């Protein structure tokens, strides 16, 4: 889901986000920086998206987006969410209700909210 729908949507709509005054699109995942770099290259994000790892879940736990997927062999992961930050202040934070979903946090849906 992430590589097929979620991330590509933000790459596709990057210019529209810029038109709305969004300075940076950052993708945060519970992975190390090497995985994030490879994932970014595989999805041709270029300089459109900052790929940021949260391997120890520090940020993910701080915002309450951690989910236990141990039953699926994945351990503690991050739920999908979108966050709009302005001057270091969170303006909007929307988290998916279903961890397998990509509706609320989809690029086209979030674009309409900023």
Model-identified regions with their sequence ranges:
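Chalcogenol-based redox active-site neighborhoods
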Residues: 1-114
């Amino acid at each position: 889901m992430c590589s097929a729908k979620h991330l590509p949507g933000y790459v596709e709509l990057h210019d529209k986000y810029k038109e709305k005054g969004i300075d940076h699109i950052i993708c945060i995942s519970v992975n190390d920086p090497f995985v994030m770099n490879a994932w970014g290259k595989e999805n041709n994000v270029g300089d459109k998206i900052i790929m940021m790892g949260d391997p120890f879940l520090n940020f993910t736990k701080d915002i309450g987006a951690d989910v236990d997927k141990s039953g699926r062999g994945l351990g503690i992961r991050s739920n999908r969410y979108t966050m709009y930050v302005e001057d270091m202040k969170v303006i909007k934070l929307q988290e998916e209700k279903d961890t397998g979903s990509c509706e609320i946090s989809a690029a086209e849906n979030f674009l309409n909210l900023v």
